Amino acid sequence: QQDREIDAGVHTWARKMAHQPVLTYITPPFEETTEITGHIKLKLWVSSETGDMDVFAKLHKLIDDEGRFFQLTEGSLKVSHRKLDDDLSTDYRPFHTHDAEQKLAKDEIVPIELEIWPTSMVFQPGERLVLELSPHNIQFYDGVYNSGTHHIYTGGETASYLQVPIIPAKK
């Protein structure tokens, strides 16, 4: 285990993303002041060449076109622990039982629901929301310990999505 220093303040996206196994989705700029407050759910359709995969999801607020951002919240899930408790799960908050290991068959496509911790943030016009997906926590681990090719599906019957609670503006 090596010590890590985490810089305070606003980070630059280009510096953060150099040489990292990351899939990034960036929204168009917000057109008006927008508040996001509450629980966030990420539904993904995934497959892997291996029997399992880890998914780390982070949300960032992208402040400007120069890539300045800061992290809002995060969540993670080992896909073999995707089993949900139907009684405790809600539309906005999945609850995983962690009582059964559901390994993936090679290239089997399965849905997962990942809880991203609640947050509250106001976005100004021009700012963007960024979803970052990776196979490990890139903030703390240099190497990839989860090898193999993983796939995320985004269309048709396997449409993945991010469910975000937007608070209506006060009139």
What are the roles of these predicted feature ranges?
Residues 1-171:
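Intrinsically disordered, low-complexity Ser/Thr/Gly-rich stretches
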